[in-house]
């Protein structure tokens, strides 16, 4: 990977929306599960996770829209009187009998599940601004969670608590390359290069019958130096990328047929949550991550940190039945676990990385995650990594229109082609000129490097040591903190894991001789 980029996907992040989400029944909800230990997480992470909207529910719970409006009116009335006893929360009638709690699923609109161990889950939407005013009565000390005593009132009522604004947790965040805007604030490069007029230009492009080159605008376009470092595409693995896509098309006829045959049907929000919850239980991380569903994401998913809280965003328009767990292995089993493990290491800061002379964690990070995406598929074609690599290379020599037409030989659907072209041309204003944002070549680059050295890589340590390159593992293992490290379930059986790596080599017709010659 390019030295300055260390992030998966962060093309769009609605931080202003997430900041407005509230937790119902915070007093009752924030209870730690005696069966679960968060010893592997620092107190800072716990504090940020518990105070940014993650309630202690684990099963989806949402009131109907009309009930929600009535509830908000009731809460607003109650909260305006400071010395008055709090009114009942909408769920108080059910809280008397835990067995009566039912899992209601979200209807329409985007929202967020907030989860902690041991109890049911709450789904909070932000479509209507909340008038609720909370009091501060939650405190966190050390690595444990301290709660205020219950109100002594004999009447069983529930308090609504305002969660204090969290401190940013830079250690947990992926290392983003940043630039400064005019106000001096730091900018994530992937956020800065997302066009603000994307929908408008898409409409104009489609109306022109694909002959108009979009003119993108940016909220913070002052990154010429940073963009210049990522405008050089490589052709090192171009032959392999083309071969992988051609093999896929030979077997399935078209990408669309490949997608349907191997990915399965698109999932509803209910089924997405069911799969996510099941996977989190399997990995022992239920309650540690906020899950957000959206349709406004160029990638399939992203694992980021919002206000110090690990947040998984899933693009529901691409969430397919047989591919979703692969995405979870990519985002949680790879990025999240390596990020958590990194916190305990001496190189968990920029100073530490410089002191120990660490190589960039990419392309290892994204290569490993991309392998895990296809690990258990029947036909683990590296299609997406190959198409991203190819598209970036072609973008460096073509205009937007030319690129759109060129990748039509691999992908027919115009909306899918648009997404790939935008990813390759992001950061550019006039897309009639040749030019690319080369970050997306890191996936195939990383995959092929890891496959090249798969026999010598200790994959267990590669995860346990945190955000490190496979090239640094041997020299860092003596310095590493290995107690309480988090390793995903699919790495527990080493022989099975290696068998699947061999399967990936076979299906994509990659040979050791070829990789040794290239790398």
Curated annotation (Swiss-Prot):
Pfam families assigned to the protein according to its UniProt record, in alphabetical order: MATCAP
Binding positions for Zn(2+) per the UniProt entry: 330, 335, 366
Region (Disordered): 63-103
Keywords: Carboxypeptidase, Hydrolase, Metal-binding, Metalloprotease, Protease, Zinc
GO term, biological process aspect, one: proteolysis
Parts forming coiled coils: none
Enzyme Commission (EC) number: 3.4.17.-
GO MF term list: carboxypeptidase activity; metal ion binding; metallopeptidase activity
Cofactor: Zn(2+)
Annotated cofactor note: Binds 1 zinc ion per subunit.
Enzyme class per UniProt: hydrolase
Domain notes: Putative metalloprotease with an atypical HExxxH zinc-binding motif instead of HExxH, which interrupts the active site-containing helix without affecting the integrity of the catalytic site arrangement.
Function comment: Putative tyrosine carboxypeptidase.
Protein name: Putative tyrosine carboxypeptidase MATCAP2
Organism: Mus musculus (Mouse)
Lineage: Eukaryota, Metazoa, Chordata, Craniata, Vertebrata
């Amino acid at each position: 990977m390019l030295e300055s980029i260390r992030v998966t996907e962060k093309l769009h992040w609605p931080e202003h929306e997430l900041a407005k989400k509230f937790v119902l029944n915070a007093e009752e909800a924030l209870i730690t599960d005696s069966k679960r230990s968060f010893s592997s997480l620092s107190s800072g992470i716990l504090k940020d996770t518990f105070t940014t909207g993650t309630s202690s529910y684990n099963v989806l719970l949402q009131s109907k829209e009309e009930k929600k409006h009535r509830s908000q009116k009731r809460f607003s009335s109650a909260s305006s009187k400071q010395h008055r006893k709090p009114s009942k929360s909408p769920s108080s009638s059910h809280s008397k009998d835990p067995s009566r709690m039912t899992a209601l699923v979200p209807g329409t609109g985007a929202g967020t599940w907030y989860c902690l161990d041991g109890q049911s889950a709450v789904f909070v939407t932000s479509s209507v601004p909340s008038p609720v005013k909370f009091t501060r009565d939650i405190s966190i000390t050390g690595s444990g969670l301290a709660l205020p005593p219950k109100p002594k009132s004999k009447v069983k009522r529930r308090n609504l608590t305002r969660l204090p604004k969290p401190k940013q947790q830079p250690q947990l965040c992926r290392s983003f390359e940043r630039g400064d805007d005019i106000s001096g604030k730091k900018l994530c490069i992937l956020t800065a290069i997302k066009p603000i007029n994307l929908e408008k230009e898409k409409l104009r492009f489609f109306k022109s019958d694909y002959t108009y080159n979009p003119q993108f605008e940016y909220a913070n376009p002052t990154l010429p130096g940073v963009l210049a470092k990522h405008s050089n595409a490589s052709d090192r693995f171009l032959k392999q990328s083309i071969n992988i896509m051609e093999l896929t098309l030979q077997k399935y006829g078209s990408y669309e047929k490949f997608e349907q045959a191997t990915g399965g049907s698109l999932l509803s929000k209910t089924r997405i949550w069911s799969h996510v919850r099941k996977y989190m239980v399997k990995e022992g991380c239920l309650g540690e991550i906020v899950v957000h569903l959206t349709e406004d994401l160029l990638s399939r998913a992203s694992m980021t940190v919002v206000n110090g809280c690990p947040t998984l965003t899933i693009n529901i328009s691409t969430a397919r039945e047989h591919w979703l767990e692969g995405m979870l292995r990519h985002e949680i089993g790879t990025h999240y676990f390596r990020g958590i493990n990194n916190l305990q290491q001496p190189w968990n800061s920029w100073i530490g990385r410089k002191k120990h002379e660490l190589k960039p964690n990419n392309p290892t990070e994204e290569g490993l995650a991309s392998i895990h995406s296809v690990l258990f598929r029947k036909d683990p074609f590296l299609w997406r990594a190959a198409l991203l690599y190819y598209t970036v290379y072609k973008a460096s020599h073509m205009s937007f229109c030319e690129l759109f037409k060129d990748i039509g030989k691999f992908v027919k659907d115009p909306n899918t082609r648009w997404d790939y072209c935008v990813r390759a041309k992001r950061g550019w204003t006039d897309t009639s000129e040749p030019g690319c944002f080369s970050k997306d070549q890191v996936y195939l680059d990383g995959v092929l490097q890891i496959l090249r050295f798969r026999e010598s890589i200790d994959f267990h340590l590669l995860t346990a040591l945190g955000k490190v390159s496979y090239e640094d593992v041997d020299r860092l293992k003596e310095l590493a903190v290995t107690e309480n490290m988090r390793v995903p379930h699919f790495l527990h059986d080493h022989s099975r894991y290696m068998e699947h790596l061999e399967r990936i080599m076979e299906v994509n017709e990659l040979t050791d001789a070829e990789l040794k010659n290239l790398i």
